[in-house]
Amino acid sequence: MKFLFIGDASNARYTLAKGLRELGHEALVIGTRGKWRRMNVDICVERGAGRVGAVVYLLRWLLLLPKLRGYDIVDFNGQFFMDFKPGLKRLFFDYLRKHNRYVISTLLGLGHYYVKGCVEAKLFRSSDFNIGDTPRTNAFASQMADEWLNQPEVVKLSRHMAETSHLLVGTGYEYWACLHHYFPEKTCFVPLPMETPEEPANIGETQGPVRIFIGIQKERDEEKGTDILWRVLQRLNNDYPDKMTLVRAENVPYDEYCRMMAGSDILVDQLYTCYAMNALIAMSMGIVAATVAIPEAYALLSEKESFPMIDLPPDEEGIYRQLEHYVLHPERLAEAKRQSIAFVRKRHHYLEVARQYMSLMGRLEKNNP
């Protein structure tokens, strides 16, 4: 079979495409490298600055279009598949839908139905837009709620893509739950794929101070809650300077991020929403992930035995106590590291995820004879 992925986030589609190729299929990923993050794509199409950059970007896509026909599945990264205004995105989407067998819209990040599920349906105890019954009113939450719920062209494209895609895919618990809430008949869950390297050497007993790593994207500080996490980590480091080492990476390319994280004991990832690629990268390296890991996320994976992540509550004192426990008891990290590696291999191995993705074809053929 032939698969085309348009747009990516954190190498998720690129890793899935690798798995599909190893299973004997054709797969192509087109997108951007993500500014300073420098992600992997097969064909890089990035928009340059100014009017000239916009024209060149449009021409590149127009030249590519004739080559993007005849695929079994075209998978769009929500509305982030191209850097155009909604009206032009719709034209490209409709063209690709017409000239390929099936189209899937995958939610890998923010989108109309995700924001709608958080703000209007209030599906979650905490999210990018609420903590319990209290709305988050920071600049990011307010701006994103307005953009995804109140901008007519954005809403119109979101509805069009959701209604005309043959399937909708959520890659994390919240994304799946929001899509399923509004489109239960056509929503599927496919886990994030992860390559699992050979078992690392640092999964034995922690020697010396506990090494805690945090990666920060400055422009997404409030969204991810890393402003709060960094504040808690500084306090913890001040209280236990001899028992922990704190490492911070800010706006670094993907490969450098992985190098800086290697050898850490704990990754402190994010608040408000469930674990994603950063946590999986860490776990595959034998690093314990401190993130959001609610029971519903494990249940969606049918996981009933292994719960290796440190589940962070959305309050500073709770975060402090969770992390303090491991700073004071580093001997408990070794088993959590082993469980982390096993969890990723069992639930997120890229070849297994590729097989799950391929199984969507049966549902597509059944629903669209």
Label every model-predicted segment.
Residues 39, 105-151, 219, 294, ...:
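Acceptor-binding helix/loop patch of EC 2.4 sugar-transfer enzymes
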Residues 114-115, 145-187, 231:
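A short, active-site helix/loop in glycosyltransferases that binds the activated sugar's phosphate group
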Residues 188-224, 230:
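Conserved donor-binding/catalytic core segment of Leloir-type glycosyltransferases
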Residues 262-273, 287-288:
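Acidic donor-binding loop of glycosyltransferase active sites
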Residues 288-297:
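Short hydrophobic beta-strand element within catalytic cores of glycosyltransferases
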Residues 328-362:
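A charged, aromatic-enriched C-terminal amphipathic alpha-helix characteristic of glycosyltransferases
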